[in-house]
């Protein structure tokens, strides 16, 4: 039995779904590192999808017929990250809460492009708090819709992408088909 099978066995997901889960989160898609195994990276991806990405998309699906919903996907790795990783002695990549360094006065060193990203994110957050619509100079953030399934990818450069472009539509559709975990 593979690592993935062992991890998913605890969720009472029937055997029919195991093959699909292994396909979506096959540890062979990832690289063993000094700090973590391929299984860890597969599990991390699964956890992020099950706990954050897919519930946000599912909630947007439920709420969007009644009011505007704005989803984002933060995927920027800070240029200073290699220095922090040396201190942490582990690769960090993009992790939950990474975007907060752009919103609040966190003592991290940003390059010029990251400063622009920070400025845009602050404008989005403050205009949303003020008006209920996230607006930033030169960047549109469309309301989420079932038909388009678009999110704003916060990165350098920023862009509006479909969940399928970032590999999440197929994953979230699968989890929606079996119900919330």
Walk through the language-model features, giving the residues of each.
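Substrate-gating cap/lid region and adjacent catalytic-acid/histidine neighborhood
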Residues: 1-115, 124, 131
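Alpha/beta-hydrolase-fold serine-hydrolase catalytic core, especially in secreted/extracellular enzymes
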Residues: 39-40, 64-69, 77-78, 109-181
């Amino acid at each position: 039995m593979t690592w993935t099978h062992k991890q998913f066995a605890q969720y009472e997901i029937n055997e029919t779904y195991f093959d699909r889960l292994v396909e979506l989160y096959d540890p062979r898609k990832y690289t063993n590192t000094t700090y973590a195994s391929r299984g860890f990276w597969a599990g991390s991806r699964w956890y992020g999808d099950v706990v954050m990405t897919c519930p946000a998309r599912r909630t947007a699906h439920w709420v969007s017929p009644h009011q505007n919903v704005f989803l984002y996907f933060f995927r920027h790795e800070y240029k200073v990250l290699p220095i922090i990783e040396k201190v942490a002695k582990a690769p960090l990549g993009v992790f939950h809460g990474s975007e907060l360094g752009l919103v609040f006065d966190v003592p991290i060193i940003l390059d010029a492009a990251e400063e622009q990203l920070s400025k845009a994110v602050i404008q989005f957050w403050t205009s949303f708090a003020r008006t209920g619509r996230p607006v930033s100079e030169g960047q549109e953030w469309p309301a989420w819709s079932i038909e388009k399934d678009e999110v704003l990818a916060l990165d350098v450069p920023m862009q509006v992408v479909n969940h399928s472009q970032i590999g999440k539509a197929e994953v979230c559709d699968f989890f929606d088909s079996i119900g919330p975990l």
